Amino acid sequence: MAADEELSGVWQARVVTLFPDAFPGVLGLSLTGKALQDGRWQLHTHDLRSFGVGKHRNVDDTPAGGGAGMVMRADVVGPAIEAAQRFARGRWPILYMSPRGRPFTQKMAKDLARCDGVTVLCGRFEGVDERVLEHFGVTEVSIGDYVLTGGEIAAQTVLDATVRLLPGVLGNAESTVEESHSNGLLEHPQYTRPAIWEGHAIPEVLMSGNHAEIAKWRAAQSHRLTQSRRPDLWAAKGAKE
């Protein structure tokens, strides 16, 4: 979407990337895609290549001090971020998708959804010149303890988790209340028809119509799953209480 097509007051994502064609990607599908079409949020990309230097629009160079790979240049990434930030207003953080960043969490998604927008920098190669991150006060964010070939997939993950929390994006707002991580715990198991499949029956309590017992069962299952699969979350939950 072009900059002159902005809708006033709508939550925006501005993505600085070498591969603008990667967007909207999955963000253009399902609920996030419908919300994008309906103008509930906006997505703009800024092509790093257009800020490249020299005849070949170079965006990277060899690491200072030696080493493998290439590093994205400050005099390329810097102007690209400045171009994106010209449209920033109010609370508008700049994120850099990086395996050394802060772990992305549901709480972070909620915080981003309360902002007016976000600029996301997608790295490539060995990363970005550190001076850019320091100059713009960029927050480094990681979606897990592994390395991707670039930040585009990670950026879409962060944006998907955030956009679905914006008002009016989800058909049922209660979905965000009961799902995993909404209260620091993993979500309870879900079932639907048929009542019996391949010899496996839906737990009787869920078919009982007793809402108090159903709520009790779901809470117990949520606790059980969190304890067994995410002891770190369980410990953090206990510490808060």
From Swiss-Prot:
Protein purpose: Specifically methylates guanosine-37 in various tRNAs.
Protein name listed in UniProt: tRNA (guanine-N(1)-)-methyltransferase
Record key words, sorted: Cytoplasm, Methyltransferase, S-adenosyl-L-methionine, Transferase, tRNA processing
Keyword Cytoplasm applies: yes
Enzyme class, UniProt record, top EC level: transferase
Subunit note: Homodimer.
GO cellular component, one term: cytosol
Keyword Chaperone on entry: no
GO MF term list: tRNA (guanine(37)-N1)-methyltransferase activity
EC code: 2.1.1.228
Domain of life: Bacteria
Reaction catalysed by this enzyme: guanosine(37) in tRNA + S-adenosyl-L-methionine = N(1)-methylguanosine(37) in tRNA + S-adenosyl-L-homocysteine + H(+)
A Pfam family that the UniProt record links to this protein: tRNA_m1G_MT
Any single biological process term in GO: tRNA N1-guanine methylation
